[in-house]
Amino acid sequence: MPCQHYQRGDCRSCQWLATPYSTQLAKKQQHLQQQLQKLDCTQIQWQAPYTSILQGFRNKAKMAVSGMVERPILSHPQSEADLTDCPLYPAHFTNIFTILRDFIARAGLVPYNIQKQKGELKYILLTESQLDGGLMLRFVLRSEKKLPLVQRELPGLLAKLPQLKVVSLNIQPQHAAILEGEKEIFLTEQHTLEECFNQIPLFIRPQGFFQTNPQVAQGLYGTAQHWVQELPVHRLWDLFCGVGGFGLHCAQALQTQYPDRIIQLTGIEISASAIEAATLSAQKLGLKQVKFQSLDAKHFALAQSPAAQDDTPELVIVNPPRRGIGIELAQFLNQLAPHFILYSSCNAETMGKDVLHLSDYQLKKVQLFDMFPHTSHYEVLCLLERK
């Protein structure tokens, strides 16, 4: 992927950009295998890595704003160079950024100066849906002082960018390296951006996590769906469920595969906004026996009784943050004894440790998903079966 910013040294976010893609994949696959070398790998069906397109794959831009209000600079937080033509973004983002620069000037959104601790506009967060090209635009501001000016100029912005579905101000008053604050002021009637992967509607909300590589994310969810649809299960837990991507894909596939069977899904996620999005997706799919709750996934699980056999899930899906599920939850899952565990991880090192603690389970399938080309990061999906 040619990138003038990398060549000039303006941005080194893509630290492996000079490495051939086949070599990138080989290094990631080797790293993944190293994390599992302490386990019994004799029964693993290794799937070929799921590859990504190499540019234009990101659906989200997180731009720090600096410079002057008449000529704002939109860059990555670690760079001071204008990066609006970053090749990781779709090519049409460049024109959108041009329109947003003009809006910043018209609304008087003075870029926040970190050294002087003055100014208002800290970040612009732009997300695009692959469903219909709809956009969610968020301005991260220090205060609400510019709200009247933003409201005054908003009709002009919507006329220039009719694909804008959700526009909001996020208020982050602290002088700290924090991306966003708690308060979200919506300027549009619509508060969620609809996406669709594999005929499963998903909803992106402000302050909620959503994968930034939709092509690979769709493959990740679709693979989980494919692995699960033939399993003899009808009760599912989806821990750390986010907006419900894994659980809904699996529940819908099982319901289609076994139309006479009642498929029960319980999804747990600490983010209330993500739970709202997941509930909306379940309603749109018409799934009846689905319950999403805003709770700490670990605390929820540990509060359950492994002896309550009637309610024991046959499949537990875990998609934890980088720290993994930890020893305590792994030991609980050994006691709970679901037939299968589907583990999706963004950190193979902690996943390897977790699977080692899932001593009652045998790894059956493993696949790497290259969600972040040109970097050392990747995601991995594993299917474990009770021994």
UniProtKB/Swiss-Prot annotation:
Keyword Metal-binding: yes
Tagged with keyword Lipid biosynthesis: no
Top-level enzyme category: transferase
Chemical reaction(s) catalysed: uridine(747) in 23S rRNA + S-adenosyl-L-methionine = 5-methyluridine(747) in 23S rRNA + S-adenosyl-L-homocysteine + H(+)
InterPro entries per the UniProt record, alphabetical: 23SrRNA_MeTrfase_RlmC, MeTrfase_TrmA_AS, MeTrfase_TrmA_CS, SAM-dependent_MTases_sf, U5_MeTrfase_fam
Keywords on record: 4Fe-4S, Iron, Iron-sulfur, Metal-binding, Methyltransferase, rRNA processing, S-adenosyl-L-methionine, Transferase
CDD domains: AdoMet_MTases
One Gene Ontology biological process: rRNA base methylation
Residues involved in S-adenosyl-L-methionine binding: 211, 240, 269, 319
Active-site residues (renumbered): 346
GO terms for MF: 4 iron, 4 sulfur cluster binding; iron ion binding; rRNA (uridine-C5-)-methyltransferase activity
Protein residues bound to [4Fe-4S] cluster: 3, 11, 14, 86
Enzyme Commission number(s): 2.1.1.189
Coiled-coil residues: none
Listed HAMAP family: 23SrRNA_methyltr_RlmC
Family per record: Belongs to the class I-like SAM-binding methyltransferase superfamily. RNA M5U methyltransferase family. RlmC subfamily.
Function: Catalyzes the formation of 5-methyl-uridine at position 747 (m5U747) in 23S rRNA.
Name by which UniProt lists this protein: 23S rRNA (uracil(747)-C(5))-methyltransferase RlmC
